[in-house]
């Protein structure tokens, strides 16, 4: 089955995160229990939080993320929403084989079984193009055939995305919460509400080994204005460091303190 091809919009600085809770103003929250996350993790808002319980994270934790990250996520979400549908789908997608294109569900999608993607992408799936609709996957597996890149798969969801006992491929942009329970997830989980991960191995897209443009990272024993590009801050005092998160200037700490800085390398997605 083929569908109208499209160019995937840029995620901007939001694409630097494997997991992002971009909730407006208050309530950004990422919770991970008995899982793993490979990539950066971010949460937005005045009460931003990232809670780990037996969940190692390979990457930076940023809470709160900058306003630009949230704005880039919202822009990308709107851009995907505006992409015309190529083929409308119904059913669970069990046993389906899909070439690159834009595939749409007008309402909610409940998915099970195995979906095979052939070619090199991109694949764009839109759930709830009629205005409302959640993505629910149970024992749902996505596999690549023909050497396709999991990072060329995007799932735009009008409301929440919930995956249970699934081996999922693709980046989710959700209009509400994302919940991942047991299984594997290869892509970025980006939501306008909370992201809850339980017993799931999340591998960001790509697994972040460096930092992209606009990605905030915490300084680690860097000399102020030295090799790590950190401003002098009050050592080990994030709230009063002279950083990019709006803290008040503190006394220069030994070897630079715990300020933050913006990396200047190229973004992993353009």
Task: Report each predicted region and the residues it spans.
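Solvent-exposed adhesion/ligand-recognition segments of exported proteins
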Residues: 2-214
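Extracellular calcium-associated, cysteine-rich motifs in secreted modular proteins
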Residues: 210-262
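Intrinsic disorder/low-complexity segments enriched in small, polar and charged residues
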Residues: 264-266
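Short, solvent-exposed mixed-charge patches
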Residues: 268-270
């Amino acid at each position: 089955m083929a569908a109208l091809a499209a160019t995937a919009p840029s995620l901007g600085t939001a694409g630097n995160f494997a997991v992002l809770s971009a909730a407006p103003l208050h309530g950004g929250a990422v919770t991970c229990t008995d899982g793993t996350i490979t990539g950066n993790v971010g949460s937005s808002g005045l009460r931003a939080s990232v809670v780990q319980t037996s969940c190692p994270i390979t990457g930076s934790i940023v809470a709160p993320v900058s306003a630009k990250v949230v704005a880039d996520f919202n822009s990308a979400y709107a851009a995907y929403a505006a992409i015309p549908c190529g083929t409308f789908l119904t059913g669970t997608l069990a046993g389906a084989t899909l070439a690159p294109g834009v595939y749409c569900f007008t309402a909610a999608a409940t998915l099970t079984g195995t979906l095979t993607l052939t070619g090199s992408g991109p694949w764009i799936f839109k759930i709830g193009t009629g205005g409302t609709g959640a993505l629910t996957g149970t024992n749902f597996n996505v596999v690549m055939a023909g050497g396709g890149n999991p990072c060329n798969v995007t799932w735009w969801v009008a409301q929440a995305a919930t995956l249970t006992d699934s081996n999922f491929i693709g980046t989710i942009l959700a209009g509400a919460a994302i919940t991942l329970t047991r299984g594997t997830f290869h892509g970025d989980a980006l939501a306008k509400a909370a992201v809850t991960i339980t017993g799931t191995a999340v591998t960001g897209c790509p697994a972040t080994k460096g930092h992209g443009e606009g990605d905030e990272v915490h300084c680690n024993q860097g000399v102020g204005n030295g090799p790590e590009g950190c401003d002098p801050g009050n050592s080990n005092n994030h709230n009063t460091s002279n950083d990019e998160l709006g803290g008040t200037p503190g006394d220069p700490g030994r070897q630079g303190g715990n300020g933050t800085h913006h990396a200047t390398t190229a973004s992993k997605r353009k």
